[in-house]
Regions:
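Gly/Ala-rich beta-loop-alpha elbow adjacent to hydrolase catalytic centers
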Residues: 36, 40
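Patatin-like phospholipase
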Residues: 1-35, 45-233
């Protein structure tokens, strides 16, 4: 049975989500559909494309450290360098990106996208899903596919599954109270590293929540069993 794994809005908590995603890499994700918005897009697209989560995180931190660009440009330029066409293909109909469309009266409407024409279209979609006016750039909205788009958070669906399947939701306050200021976009790489480790450790401490929905990858499970046998000997 297909499971939907949902990553909510995040701001700087994208680093926390990536820590969780490093743990999820140990599980069988072959029958999983991901949905997400804002920084919650990153773990979704990386887990679908089997990229190494920690390597991605280390590289984006290095990029952030050496860039004075807005978050809009950081995300766009870094993903353009990092992602391959194969990564985009791995996300076709396996990742549901949540966006907020501003209608003619600038009122928010929920929109989802799960297929893309090419790598450029894919990256533009993710950038739009992450766009918070003023905080991420100097525009009021992003133009995407001819529509006025902002972060999916503004349509109130970031915590809501898209499908009717069994789901596993990750949001900032799932396992602990998170001060709202932690969600503000930050380029403090030391702070972002601490959030990553916090997410990783919280996932391990609450592993039963994950194991109630996902099964460990068979290769990883066999390795764990073999390690246990060696320890008993």
């Amino acid at each position: 049975m297909t499971v939907e794994v949902v990553f909510s809005h995040s701001g700087s908590m994208f680093a926390y989500y990536l820590g969780i995603a490093e743990v999820l890499q140990e599980y069988d994700l072959s029958d999983v559909i991901f949905s997400g918005t804002s920084g919650g897009c990153f773990p979704c697209i990386l887990l679908n494309s089997s990229n190494n989560i920690r390597d991605f995180f280390d590289e984006i931190l290095e990029y952030v450290k050496n860039s004075n660009d807005s978050w809009e440009n950081v995300i766009k330029n870094f993903l353009t360098e990092y992602l391959s066409d194969e990564d985009v293909e791995a996300n076709q109909n396996k990742f549901i990106c949540k966006l907020t469309k501003l209608n003619d009266f600038l009122l928010p409407e929920k929109v989802t996208v799960s297929s893309w024409r090419d790598k450029e279209d894919f990256i533009n979609c993710v950038v739009a899903a992450c766009y918070v006016p003023i905080m991420c750039g100097n525009k009021f909205y992003i133009e995407y596919r001819g529509e006025k788009i902002v972060d999916g958070f503004f349509s109130g669906t970031s915590n809501t599954p898209v499908t009717n399947n069994e789901h596993l939701l990750f949001h900032p306050n799932k396992w602990r109270y998170i001060n709202p200021t932690w969600m503000l976009p930050s380029k403090d790489t030391v702070w972002l590293k601490s959030l990553y480790e916090l997410g990783y450790n919280d996932a391990l401490a609450n592993i039963q929540d994950i194991q109630s929905v996902l099964k460990m990858n068979k290769e990883k499970e066999l390795k764990t069993q073999n390690d246990s046998v060696r320890q008993s000997e």
